[in-house]
Amino acid sequence: DLVRSRGLGDVYKRQVGENFYANVNLVILDGAKVRIGDNAFIAPNVGIYTAGHPLDASDRNKGLEYAYPITIGNNVWIGAGAIILPGVTIGNNVVIGAGSVVTKNIPAYSLAVGNPCRVIKRIDE
């Protein structure tokens, strides 16, 4: 299933796998491609943001921004209120705890929590 959205004259894509479920208030800011795998479950109030702005105020004031793709693997559960930031890949069979801020890649078969999000346990294959 491929969904296209239009923004600022460009076409961006969100690709969603089979048996995907998202609860209320999911926000996907798709300045770059977002891929969500099969059997992915997303709790309420999750934000998936591909876009960001420079730290330097003069660059921000020029209207500069960046966007990096996000990939969420198969059999992933993302807890309520989690935030997924630009450029992140979440591997297959991962659980992201509620309220986590995912700033870096999370390897497959992991339980990851916190701000910033970090792996606290391996989930057996």
Regions found by a protein language model. Give the residues of each.
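Single conserved hydrophobic/aromatic residue that forms the stacking wall/gate
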Residues: 1-12
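Conserved G/P- and acidic residue-centered "switch" motifs that form tight phosphate/ATP-binding loops
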Residues: 96, 114
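Extended beta-solenoid/beta-helix repeat architectures
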Residues: 88-91, 106
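Conserved coupling/switch loop of ABC ATPases
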Residues: 4, 86, 104
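Flexible, glycine/small-residue-enriched loop-and-beta-strand segment within the central core
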Residues: 10-16, 21-89, 115-125
